[in-house]
């Protein structure tokens, strides 16, 4: 088997979701194939909205003033400031409303027994981690915020989500691999932990209301997660060896929109993508240095065994 393009072995929670839904889309995404541009505006606003709300809530948890919080949101907003996704009720100004609602909840006592964990004098927000897997594969991730109970010293991960749905079903988040991956960060900060809580705080854009879901995660679940991650890597290697990433037609229409590769995915990969340049490869490798927590698969297994799982 030829060496795998470095762009294909840089994994994340979202890229693995794409791999599971449609391997061909995963391949084209990672190799930066050209996309259909029809829905770029709404997609960029949706992406910017989630980041702005997350940043605003993190800043509010740091006890910043409202002016400071809004400035942080403004600085992270990457779409046109006046752009709006009308269908999903997402814009910069609706993000401001979402964060102001959270600040009002805090004033009324929401999470009053919880405080941000600080590491080396910095708040544990947007903590980044990189897991070094076999054959050059890397799994990258971020933790929104780590909280500590002032009374019990219990540790909890705060995970911030937004949705345009009116109803939130717990099954959407209950077995999320993303939340299990957070154990990598908690292992680094609190080696003695045997389980931890994950609090999903979900803002519903159409109702303009928050809903929360809380789950307990154990290190037994992480043992299964490690094995599943290794299986995903083996699947990618198998696709590479076969020279085929299967197309999943059931994923061509999702979230009320056509896949951006709907008219091109059947074409030759060589015609759709360019070979990686030395400059691009170096940029990816240098980007690894920006992650705060690095851990190898061996470290992960040793930690797992020390917890008796």
Language-model region placement:
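A non-catalytic, helix-rich entry segment at domain boundaries
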Residues: 52-127
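Active-site-adjacent bridging/hinge elements
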Residues: 23-31, 147, 153-159, 233-237
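Short acidic, Pro/Gly- and aromatic-enriched capping/linker segments at domain boundaries
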Residues: 2-15
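Metal-dependent nuclease catalytic regions and adjoining charged, substrate-binding loops involved
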Residues: 10-11, 99, 169-172, 184-309
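Short small-residue beta-strand/loop micro-motif enriched in glycine and branched aliphatics
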Residues: 36-39, 165-169, 211
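Nuclease catalytic cores
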Residues: 16-63, 126, 258-261
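Non-catalytic protein-protein interaction segments used by genome-maintenance enzymes to assemble
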Residues: 47, 119-179, 183-190
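Hydrophobic/aromatic-lined pockets within catalytic cores
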Residues: 32, 58-65, 147, 162-165, ...
């Amino acid at each position: 088997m030829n060496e795998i393009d470095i762009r294909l072995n840089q994994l994340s929670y979202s890229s693995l979701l794409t791999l599971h839904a449609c391997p061909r889309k995963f391949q084209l995404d990672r190799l930066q194939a050209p996309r259909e541009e029809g829905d770029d505006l709404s997609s960029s606003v949706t992406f910017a909205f989630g980041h702005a709300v997350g940043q605003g809530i993190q800043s509010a948890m740091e006890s910043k003033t409202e002016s400071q919080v809004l400035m942080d949101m403004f600085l992270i907003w990457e779409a046109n400031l006046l752009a709006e996704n009308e269908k999903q009720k997402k814009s910069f100004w609706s993000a401001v409303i979402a964060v102001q609602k959270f600040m009002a909840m805090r004033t009324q006592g929401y999470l009053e027994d919880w405080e941000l964990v600080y590491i080396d004098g910095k708040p544990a927000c947007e903590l980044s981690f990189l897991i070094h897997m076999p054959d050059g594969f890397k799994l990258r991730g971020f933790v929104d915020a780590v909280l500590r109970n002032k009374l019990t010293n219990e540790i909890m991960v705060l995970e911030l989500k937004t949705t345009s749905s009116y109803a939130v079903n717990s099954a959407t988040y209950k077995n999320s691999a993303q939340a299990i991956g957070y154990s990598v960060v908690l292992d680094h900060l609190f080696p003695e932990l045997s389980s931890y809580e994950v609090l999903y705080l979900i803002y519903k854009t159409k109702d303009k209301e928050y809903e929360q879901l809380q789950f307990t995660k154990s290190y037994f679940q992480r043992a299964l997660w490690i094995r599943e991650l290794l299986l995903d890597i083996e699947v990618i290697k198998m696709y590479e060896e076969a020279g085929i990433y299967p197309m999943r037609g059931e994923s061509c229409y999702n979230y009320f929109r056509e896949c951006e590769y709907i008219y091109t995915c059947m074409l030759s990969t060589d015609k759709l993508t360019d070979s990686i340049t030395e400059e691009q490869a170096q940029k990816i490798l240098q980007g690894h240095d920006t992650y705060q927590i690095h851990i190898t698969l061996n470290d992960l297994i040793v930690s797992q065994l020390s917890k008796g799982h």
